[in-house]
Amino acid sequence: MILINVKYKVRPEFVDTFRQEVAAFTDATRAEDGCLFFDWYRSTEEDDVYILVEGFKDDAAEAHVNSEHFKQACVDMPKLLVETPTIINTLIPGKTEWDEMAEFKVEN
């Protein structure tokens, strides 16, 4: 699995509508072969910060960055942002899904 976390600092005028602004990109990415998850989260400490958590099968990330919707997002997103996003990109060989946390269990 390729696990990617991207931190976006959003312009004040787009803070409340950011998810709608990126909805088409999000939907198109989630429909890609090899996309395991593509989930947005808003910081509870910084109102203008959104985190994108992405997971792709090992061979799917290249197709993602070469897709038309990714190329369009690279044109559209900068106008929504205060600064260039920061990213953590990690290859986890053999991984395809989330694991249960080992440190404790929730009994149902």
Question: What role is predicted for each listed range?
Answer:
Residues 41-48, 75-108:
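Glycine-rich beta-strand-turn "strand-cap" elements at beta-sheet edges
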Residues 10-15:
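Short, surface-exposed ligand-recognition loops at beta-strand->loop->(often short) alpha-helix junctions
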Residues 24, 28-36, 55-89:
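An amphipathic, aromatic/His-enriched active-site/gating alpha helix that lines ligand/cofactor pockets
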Residues 2-9, 39-65:
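Short, well-ordered beta-strand segments in beta-rich or mixed alpha/beta enzyme
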